[in-house]
Amino acid sequence: DARFAISANYTGKKGADASVGLLNDDNQEFFLTKVEYGSPSWQVSAAFASKTNGNTYDGYYHTSEGKDYSGKDLASIGLRAYWKPQETGVVPSVQVGFDMASVDEAADTNPDEMQAWMVGLGWNDLLIDGNKAGLAFGQRQHATSFKGGTKTKAYEEDNFVWEAYYTFKINDGVSVTPAIFGGEDLEADGHEVDGGVILTEFRF
């Protein structure tokens, strides 16, 4: 049966400072809440995040401009959904995600709007029982609008990444997964970065 759930989280980056404390206008605060509805075979969810007073972060899943914003507050929304078929085989499970964020009082020439998205497909028991396959593609968090309309190094924001894999189940304790991946090079216009990897798993 479908169920409904809600969760929330609050963090004060300067909460340990006695002159600032929690829930204060001078604090660098982070608030996250998520609402979801669904069952083990499907689900939809929406999350809202708010960062105040220039509270920034470091992370890998973004472009340089998507991270290096400068403003007072940041508000973002994330939408997610997944669906799994009742039977395994040719029909894949599907996952989709979309994020968007806006910066309040962004500095001139800095990003004031950002987005990210992804699509993922997964197959269980594809071709042979026990084997799996997956395909995913999307764009990392990237700037879509700059205050004043100025945008430098546009290729850094026009990013696209993808990956694909197939898992061979050798026996109950051993599996081999070759995978390939690629994406646009954020350091050079018109260049791409491609690669491959082979993962061997042993289970005892």
Predicted regions and their residues:
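Aromatic- and glycine-enriched pocket-lining scaffold segments that form the walls
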Residues: D1-E36, F160
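Transmembrane beta-strands of outer-membrane beta-barrel pores
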Residues: Y10-K14, S39-S41, F48-G54, F98-D104, ...
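Membrane-embedded beta-strands of outer-membrane beta-barrel proteins
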Residues: T33-V35, L79, V119-L121, A164, ...
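Long, well-ordered mid-to-C-terminal structural blocks that present hydrophobic/aromatic surfaces
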Residues: G38-N124
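Outer-membrane beta-barrel "beta-signal"
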Residues: E192-F204
